Amino acid sequence: MATKFPKFSQALSQDPTTRRIWYGIATAHDFESHDGMTEENLYQKIFASHFGHLAIIFLWTSGNLFHVAWQGNFEQWILNPLKVKPIAHAIWDPHFGQPALKAFSKGGSAYPVNIAYSGVYHWWYTIGMRTNQDLYTGALFLLVLSAILLFGGWLHLQPKFKPGLSWFKNNESRLNHHLSGLFGVSSLAWTGHLVHVAIPESRGQHVGWDNFTTVLPHPAGLQPFFSGNWSVYAQNPDTAQQLFGTNEGAGTAILTFLGGFHPQSQSLWLTDMAHHHLAIAVVFIVAGHMYRTNWGIGHNLKDILDAHRPPSGRLGAGHRGLFDTITNSLHMQLGLALAALGVITSLVAQHMYAMPPYAFMAKDFTTQASLYTHHQYIAGFLMVGAFAHGAIFFVRDYDPEQNKGNVLARMLEHKEAIISHLSWVTLFLGFHTLGLYVHNDTMIAFGTPEKQILIEPVFAQWIQASSGKALYGFDVLLSSSSNIATQAGSNIWLPGWLEAINSGKNSLFLTIGPGDFLVHHAIALGLHTTALILVKGALDARGSKLMPDKKDFGYSFPCDGPGRGGTCDISAWDAFYLAVFWMLNTIGWVTFYWHWKHITIWQGNATQFNESSTYLMGWFRDYLWLNSSPLINGYNPYGMNNLSVWSWMFLFGHLVWATGFMFLISWRGYWQELIETLAWAHERTPLANLIRWKDKPVAMSIVQARLVGLAHFSVGYVLTYAAFVLASTAGKFG
């Protein structure tokens, strides 16, 4: 008899019901729970999967390059990046009638195409790519790299090339190599690319495989480097009149500290970015030589952590025990990595629009909106994942003996204080923010808008002023010409920065008022509520008032409601599940705020946001309803336009989202009855009953139904808003 799926669990493979399939899928990646799994084998499997992951990423990026080179308009776009719409790829659809063919043939193409809103054209242009041939070469290189990585993954599963457990747990070596190699040397290599290829191309000088060894990136060559006269590399930067991609107004500097933006492309100066990457390379290459490995010099991480015990005794055993706890817990490591990556991804969202690094991207408004929304949602999912694995760490890996009295144990000991403080913060923020919004709504409804409670965000304005924004008249720090801070930077980066922050042509430190004050606190409410649910879920994962140790219940024990007392208190999975709703809710507010504020600024109508954002009906009517008109009119009895696809996606997203509730607001009994009724009918229907199955159909578990509901809710939510952002922005600005 052939062994049934799943091969990794004998118990599951012998289950006579459909539970075998669903639990098999659910635990396929939970390597720890597989039959016969050893710690060494676990690490080896995860290590090999990294290669596969990278191979998929490079295959995908190779596909981006290939399709743009084949079906895009990169070379035409370069000639006029502000007017020509970048094409992602062609659309082939046999269902298209003539009106659709006409509507979707845009960006100067003779056939239906998708417009690229990812910013890749701007990126490739900025880093020195100029022809379709460049794109094809890049695609081929990444394809080969992908194949090499796949081979590497396979190779590291072969007995001779499997790393041992001690190799995976050698923290100092890993830190040295990752800091020096992954961050340091790669940043140095990128600096090299910017200096040798991107900067010359931005000045109209071609550098390619044919001449890169002979073209000097700087007229003085390496002489200033070896003589220590490094400032030569910063002399003669590009002028404010430089035309990007030509030598008109171009200088010769390669490493500068100009500050602000290139006036024509409205992106950061390439020479500033090269300098930045060089600095990062130096810092990280040095950092990667700090930890003790084969030669008895450098830091030992265990010694550092064990020494972290403040003499006052207020942190108990301090960081003692953490070295082994973190080294031996993959969930703890993953939680820390996800949290760090989540923060970085959100920072990318913020910096990508406030300080655009790519030429002309600041003027491609739909791309700006897409990239912000995309990165904020990804940050949200990464953050909830961090806490989910934190909770799994407490259930599976936390050893109370090993961590006696240290900071981890103390977090658990005073978790009631942490949770209750978070709870008070959320209650305060929630009632006060909603109270202000509702008061203002009522005043608007009764025709007395002057009675609204409008609070100026004076502290935030003061912070903006201290960074150099002159508008508010706070004579403080960088907004004061006589301040010592202003004088210290006045001959290097400050002139460019101050010009940029006060120019009104970009998104640096946008002017803020009462509407911003309110939505800031609404977002703070969302962030704190999400944090409260996640923190409680993780801290209570192992033990709570009702259940001193929950280790044997596992992470995904179901919350069964008040009928089975206390089950919700012991379900870490349920905290994660609830937190995802709040995370989506919060990022909804964040992206609504960003998008509405920006489209009013881009349209030269900032007053609309300022006046309508102080009450809820303003958000519903003047942001959501007003901007959904292109979606509602995407196709109608009179035909269609090139926003029709987003209209369809808007409907489809709502449908997926609403489907989620079918799984969220129902219990297992209903599904079991439905399944058995369908199975009964199937078995008695001619022709249909030729198809039979051996597994007895069983309704999904409570946790699985919640997961299916949550997945539909999340996917539908994101799809709906994606369609809204794209159609409402592209409908206004093309």
UniProtKB/Swiss-Prot annotation:
Gene3D superfamilies: Photosystem I PsaA/PsaB. It is a multi-pass membrane protein. Pfam families: PsaA_PsaB. Its main location: plastid. Disulfide bonds: none annotated. Its EC number is 1.97.1.12. GO terms for cellular component: chloroplast thylakoid membrane; photosystem I. Chlorophyll a B1 binds at H654. It catalyses: reduced [plastocyanin] + hnu + oxidized [2Fe-2S]-[ferredoxin] = oxidized [plastocyanin] + reduced [2Fe-2S]-[ferredoxin]. Keywords: 4Fe-4S, Chlorophyll, Chloroplast, Chromophore, Electron transport, Iron, Iron-sulfur, Magnesium, Membrane, Metal-binding, Oxidoreductase, Photosynthesis, Photosystem I, Plastid, Thylakoid, Transmembrane, Transmembrane helix, Transport. GO terms for molecular function: 4 iron, 4 sulfur cluster binding; chlorophyll binding; electron transfer activity; magnesium ion binding; oxidoreductase activity. [4Fe-4S] cluster binds at C559, C568. P700 is a chlorophyll a/chlorophyll a' dimer, A0 is one or more chlorophyll a, A1 is one or both phylloquinones and FX is a shared 4Fe-4S iron-sulfur center. The keyword Zinc does not apply. InterPro entries: PSI_PsaA/B, PSI_PsaA/B_CS, PSI_PsaA/B_sf, PSI_PsaB. It is found in: Plastid, Chloroplast thylakoid membrane. One of its GO terms (biological process) is photosynthesis. PROSITE patterns: PHOTOSYSTEM_I_PSAAB. It is an enzyme of class 1 (oxidoreductase). The PsaA/B heterodimer binds the P700 chlorophyll special pair and subsequent electron acceptors. PSI consists of a core antenna complex that captures photons, and an electron transfer chain that converts photonic excitation into a charge separation. The eukaryotic PSI reaction center is composed of at least 11 subunits. Belongs to the PsaA/PsaB family. PsaA and PsaB bind P700, the primary electron donor of photosystem I (PSI), as well as the electron acceptors A0, A1 and FX. PSI is a plastocyanin/cytochrome c6-ferredoxin oxidoreductase, converting photonic excitation into a charge separation, which transfers an electron from the donor P700 chlorophyll pair to the spectroscopically characterized acceptors A0, A1, FX, FA and FB in turn. Oxidized P700 is reduced on the lumenal side of the thylakoid membrane by plastocyanin or cytochrome c6. This is Photosystem I P700 chlorophyll a apoprotein A2. It comes from Porphyra purpurea. The gene is psaB.
